[in-house]
Amino acid sequence: MAFNVSALGFGDNVVDRYEHIRTMYPGGNAVNFAVYAKKCGAARSAYMGIFGNDAAAEHVIASLEDEDVELAKCKQLIGENGAARVTVVNGDRVFLGSNEGGIRGDTRYVLDRFDLAYMKQ
């Protein structure tokens, strides 16, 4: 059931690399918001942020496309995508380190008038 609601997740995207099972999961608060808005029935859901150009970024992009989340206003730059190294100890997640957001941590997203118009839709 779709609702006449539009949602936009703006900000972070990362992969959590679970080292003990050699598996990457996409995430980040803004990405998760956009995905769950779509799953909960938003007629339109988008993510707006900065991706790197590595395998982690391509994994997040493909995952968002699979969830029918719009990516029209994203930027993809040369560099590592945000990533965290994770394992599980006694059933709890343990974060082993990260690359501090990768390229997104080093680059500000500067909004222009076209971005602002898109956000109002």
Which residues fall in each region the model found?
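Histidine-anchored nucleotide/phosphate-binding helix
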Residues: A30-K39
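Small side chains
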Residues: G9, A37, S45-A46
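A short, glycine/small-residue-rich beta-strand->loop->alpha-helix junction that serves as a flexible
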Residues: I21-N29
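Conserved strand-loop elements at the edges of beta-sheets that form or border functional pockets
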Residues: G9, G27, Q76
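Conserved N-terminal subdomain of the carbohydrate kinase-like
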Residues: V15-Y18, A43-K120
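Conserved acidic residues
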Residues: V5, K120-Q121
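Short glycine/serine/threonine-rich phosphate/pyrophosphate-binding segments
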Residues: N29-A30, N81
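Positively charged, low-complexity intrinsically disordered leader regions
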Residues: M1-R22
